[in-house]
């Protein structure tokens, strides 16, 4: 569901299809278009209807904090991310290219130019 957002969705589709994720699966399937799944639509609409100043998403793969999307790095994003990293012991990191499109954080950064983070809270 995380690869359902309109922020580089076509790039995500190309990458994930080349990796063999061409049909519904537990991870890495982008769907047939952005925002086709009800859960993604609900999160999208919920976000549009509120005035968030910062956004956090949680995943469970890696003890890292992702803070950018392509060239989108809103003011103070890095310093806020470093505070999260210091408090959590996680690494503030750039997103690997093959995972850097169509996520909720990506869309939030692109749409609002406000700080947004994906916190990878578990182990790989």
Language-model-derived ranges and their functions:
Residues 64-124:
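Catalytic cores of processing enzymes, dominated by hydrolases/peptidases
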